Amino acid sequence: MPKKFSQRAEDLRRALALEAARIMAEHGIEDFLQAKRKAADRLGVNDVAVLPKNVEIEAALREHQRLFGRDSHDHTLKEQRRIALDTMRMLNEFQPRLVGSVLTGTATAYSDINLHLFADASESVAIKLLEIGVPHEFYERRVKMDAERSINYPALRFDANGRTVDATVFPIDGIRQSPYSPVDGRPMKRADAREVSDLVGVN
């Protein structure tokens, strides 16, 4: 009996991961917890013990993107990375790093472009944007730095060729420590302009 229950729970977990991935891909939801809750609600699941981990949802999202509209996804991802690269070059003095789904390849058509910038003060980034005529707004982003610490950092949101860019501003020495990824709890992958250039195949 326990073995049967375990298999049923595993099947349900898999179904929830697939549904959460579908919701993220088709409805532009990027928050894993929100996608899990919506998936559980749609499948009538109340047991939080069977909710999938974020890494399981990300794997299901990759599978969904491979099976449904792969050409469209690849085209959109390349466009997002090109815009990210142009923006990084524009903000080169702040040592920009691309992070998140546009870097890892799981971005949907609704995904924002997420950058990490490094400066003594976030105002210097704002001044740069004003100088080049880019409207923007300030907000705070809570970032998990390790297992015990979460810190609020200033961030700026602006448009770049029809895509939303979210740029979090870290202190200059913040380039040495990458925050934890919300997907797997490990240090987040970061890519500089050269690495992004390699991804899109441009010089």
How would you name each of these model-derived features?
Residues P2-I29, K36-A109, D120-N203:
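Catalytic core of pol beta-like nucleotidyltransferases
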